[in-house]
From Swiss-Prot:
Annotated source species: Lysinibacillus sphaericus
Name listed for the protein in its UniProt record: Binary larvicide subunit BinA
InterPro entries linked: Ricin_B-like_lectins, Toxin_P42
Gene: binA
UniProt keyword terms in alphabetical order: Disulfide bond, Sporulation, Toxin, Virulence
Compartments, as annotated in UniProt: Spore, Perispore
Residue ranges the record assigns to the propeptide: 1-6
Function: Component of a binary toxin active against Culex and some Aedes mosquito larvae. The individual subunits are not toxic. BinAB binds to the gastric caecum and posterior midgut of C.quinquefasciatus larvae; this subunit alone binds the entire larval gut. Binary toxin internalization into host gut cells requires both proteins. Toxic to Aedes atropalpus mosquito larvae; mortality towards both C.quinquefasciatus and A.atropalpus is maximal by 48 hours. A.aegypti is not very susceptible to this toxin.
Annotated domain remarks: Has an N-terminal beta-trefoil domain and a C-terminal pore-forming domain. The trefoil domain has barrel and cap subdomains; the cap has 3 carbohydrate-binding modules while the barrel is involved in host cell receptor binding. At neutral pH the carbohydrate-binding modules are accessible on the toxin surface but the barrel subdomain is not.
Region annotation (Pore-forming domain) ranges: 156-370
Assembly: Forms a heterodimer with BinB.
Length: 370
């Protein structure tokens, strides 16, 4: 797995809940205000609910962070003049950069480091509590923009499974052996994914406390398409499938905000766009280069046995399987998301010294999302 730690030691890693403090009023933490507060204000005040005071800084590919509250999973969100707490959508206004000011303090900005978040009282020019987050262009000598990380609660990250060798092609043991329906599965890669980016029946607030990070596992295996005993010189037409079913494509998009492109690369939605580089690196996949989604295709192919003796042939296609898991390893999607890639096919045969069948005409039967 790639290293997600931040460079500066005072900036948190993905493995902690952080209690963020106003540097000016250092005794008072940032706190998600009561639901009755307008616009989900982030306040600096005396906060009675402990979970409202702790945040996870979820890192993204480019070093920005998504700051999520431990109580309900709401995230820091920029508005016209202030920063509030809102549900995560992947909006650019929910990605913050951290700029170091001293060894123990920093300030937050969305894009422009000259426009920082500013901790100010509800009444201008006052340091009375409660106060809230605004944007300001006043950076120099402005202690109101400074924040620091005080208390930390460490969390246990999911243990990712070890990667394995690519799956071996099945070997037939006799003329009547049709081979396994699936070869042994091999884990190709796994990656962490923040709980705010996935879909689960567990409430977001509960996820933030029990499984703030999920993981996605990418597995590959050889899937049998057909098997037949070819008499000497015979020709047969076989039906094969490629791609992914519409049901699986929709379920995968709903589950992890990732879909599979027509070139078998991954397409990322707004929620996961910020982690697409790390996601594909860890799972040993690629980002799609097309706007078209992969669909299921059924086609027929003609095969001819060119030998002067009977041969058993079994056709296989490479399957890529994706599963979503909670931090304790339990699988969320009970039916895995599987794509069959007909760019990678193989034909097992017996006797082993027999040549592969001669490939003839190929005809697409269906090419739709049914």
């Amino acid at each position: 797995m790639r290293n997600l730690d931040f460079i500066d030691s005072f900036i948190p890693t993905e493995g902690k809940y952080i209690r963020v403090m106003d540097f000016y009023n250092s005794e008072y933490p940032f706190c998600i205000h009561a639901p009755s507060a307008p616009n989900g204000d982030i306040m600096t005040e005396i906060c009675s609910r402990e979970n409202n005071q702790y945040f996870i800084f979820f890192p993204t590919d480019d070093g920005r962070v998504i700051i999520a509250n431990r109580h309900n999973g709401s995230v820091f969100t920029g508005e016209a003049t202030s920063v509030v707490s809102d549900i995560y959508t992947g909006s650019p206004l929910q990605f913050f950069r951290e700029f170091k000011r001293t060894m123990s303090t920093y300030y937050l900005a969305i894009q422009n480091p000259e426009s920082a978040t500013d901790v100010r009282a509800l009444e201008p020019n006052s340091h009375e509590l409660p106060s809230r987050l605004y944007f300001t262009n006043n950076i120099e000598n402005n202690s109101n923009i400074l924040i620091s990380n005080k208390e930390q609660i460490y969390l246990t990250l999911p243990s990712l499974p070890e990667n394995e060798q690519y799956p071996k092609t099945p070997v037939l043991s006799g003329i009547d052996d049709i081979g396994p329906n699936q070869s042994e599965k091999s884990i190709i890669g796994s990656t962490l994914i923040p709980c705010i980016m996935v879909s689960d029946f567990i409430s977001l607030g509960e996820r933030m406390k029990t499984t703030p990070y999920y993981y996605v596992k990418h597995t590959q295996y050889w899937q049998s398409m057909w098997s037949a005993l070819f008499p000497p010189g015979s020709k047969e037409t076989k039906t094969e499938k490629s791609g992914i079913t519409d049901t699986s494509q929709i379920s995968m998009t709903d589950g992890i905000n990732v879909s599979i492109g027509a070139d078998f690369g991954l397409k990322f939605g707004n929620k996961t766009f910020g982690i697409k580089g790390g996601f594909t690196y860890d799972t040993k996949t690629q980002i799609t280069n097309t706007s078209q989604l992969l669909i299921e295709t059924t086609y027929t192919r003609e095969y001819t046995n060119t030998e002067n003796f009977p041969v058993r042939y079994t056709g296989y296609v490479l399957a890529s399987e994706f599963t979503l898991h909670r931090s304790d390893g339990t699988q969320v999607n009970t039916i895995p998301w599987v794509a069959l890639n007909d760019n990678y096919t193989t034909i097992a045969r017996y006797p082993h010294f027999a040549s592969e069948p001669l490939l003839g005409n190929t005809k697409i039967i269906t090419d739709d999302q049914n």
